[in-house]
């Protein structure tokens, strides 16, 4: 019987040191090659937990990375398989993310943005010349070689990259990160190299003003904006940007990929190749301020998602082998959330723009006019139940990358039963109609309390709202929003995920559901609401109240609360408080002045309906925010609220809060 020889080449040739990044099935560690003393970043993937498809993607990524040898691309130096583990040895990139470096600069101009996009385009051009399409260009994947001034920009994470022949256009699957997806991908048409140029256009837009061109709280509307090319250049921030810069953006964000500028052509654009005479040298302080908020929002979302995914060991679409290389600031596992329709759906995209009717190509675009800073800090609220199979129902969005290469319209049962392998992404994706794999940037370690709570979410099962066993088919009183996606054998993923996000529950039926209106009255029809609908209404109203608190909006808060509101809360030192004056003090002196981004998570809300006009909700509330030193913090409270409906509107008449104060005080 032959003896199997186990490869130990990595162990023999490299010495491992400290961790610089971590994912669900991988870790990135600094290493030194013994024979030369050179430092690298080793991405160590636990292959014992990978599926056959994950192995194929790992091989594809390694193969692509070997092809790419360019000064603006994180380079793969070695790929070694040992028993149970695969080692990818990349450049050790120590400069952190490009966007983080920009906000730390004392001076930043249009000419600097031109230099940044030039390096990004050089990297993209090399990829395209080598027959590679990156498919996930975004700020998290743009790193700096070192902390030295003028360090080169490095493109990282080729976990979603594909190989193409020449200018081949084909359907390679639904992949990318929501705010950076091109119209052709969203329309599920054949695509190719132009998708990378579209993403470059989005990045350039952000580099110039600090917020993205496309953004909406509703992901469906976000995709509609992108497909329509609905962006604009609002005053006053765009008034100081040169016409040449706007012209390049317009050529990059051209809806028709055949007419979109190529990387080679973009590098010859006067704003890029003649920046010293064409690009403005004026310092863009407002852009830097907006970028700070943009970065803070990305980091906060990334921290939450990273914790969720790493804790729950999701392994869906792929195991990123990306050059997570790298720096403490940009490594991490690119986790595929693809088939994971049950995981983390995000309602908000990466952006920060408030809505207006101003637009370039459509009347439905968004614009950052006037109130950008508040919009950039708009608090987010996530609701996490303990539903069937541990699905997370969320109303918030992250930078999740998505990848769905198998089919345009997966079967409902496939989607709903897909939390199986895990490799988590930022994402998504993310996420498009279905969340997926993308790289995470390492962040300060989240509070242990978060992971403890998330572990409990992972262990949880059962739908919080259910008061009895679930039936095999849809309940008799489902809303049209849920019945819609189930009315055909192959519904759109986004419809299903939207219904999950709205808290309508997980469809159980695998067969076709009857088409047509539901047997019970829709929630929009006057009269008593079905209990499940009323419970969702209570949860939604509670979210609105918490958003008003996080926004420091006393007027909105007062509209939701009864004037005689009574409460027990930590701030009152155990005393029963009646009326609004006690709360007004915090709004006027603390909440209204809070300039830090806030994210609120409502864990396992339980609603008790008391007759037709009263209800009680109990939940755990996590408030995540950035403290004065720029570090992520978390506070927790346990809350109960009593609601009474008057004149068709729910009002909070009493609440009881224990634990930490409601408002973050740092």
UniProtKB/Swiss-Prot annotation:
Active site: 136 (proton acceptor)
UniProt entry keywords in alphabetical sequence: Actin-binding, ATP-binding, Calmodulin-binding, Cytoplasm, Cytoskeleton, Developmental protein, Differentiation, Intellectual disability, Kinase, Membrane, Neurogenesis, Nucleotide-binding, Phosphoprotein, Sarcoplasmic reticulum, Serine/threonine-protein kinase, Synapse, Transferase
Induction notes from the record: Activity is induced in skeletal muscle during exercise.
Modified-residue entries (Phosphothreonine), positions: 287, 306-307, 400-401
Cell compartments where the protein resides: Cytoplasm, Cytoskeleton; Cytoplasm, Cytoskeleton, Microtubule organizing center, Centrosome; Sarcoplasmic reticulum membrane; Synapse
Residue(s) carrying Phosphoserine: 367, 394, 397
Enzyme Commission code: 2.7.11.17
Binding residues annotated for ATP, in chain numbering: 20-28, 43
Keyword Phosphoprotein applies: yes
Summary of subunit composition and partner proteins: CAMK2 is composed of 4 different chains: alpha (CAMK2A), beta (CAMK2B), gamma (CAMK2G), and delta (CAMK2D). The different isoforms assemble into homo- or heteromultimeric holoenzymes composed of 12 subunits with two hexameric rings stacked one on top of the other. Interacts with SYNGAP1 and CAMK2N2. Interacts with MPDZ. Interacts with FOXO3. Interacts (when in a kinase inactive state not associated with calmodulin) with ARC; leading to target ARC to inactive synapses. Interacts with CAMK2N1; this interaction requires CAMK2B activation by Ca(2+).
Protein name: Calcium/calmodulin-dependent protein kinase type II subunit beta
Gene that specifies this protein: CAMK2B
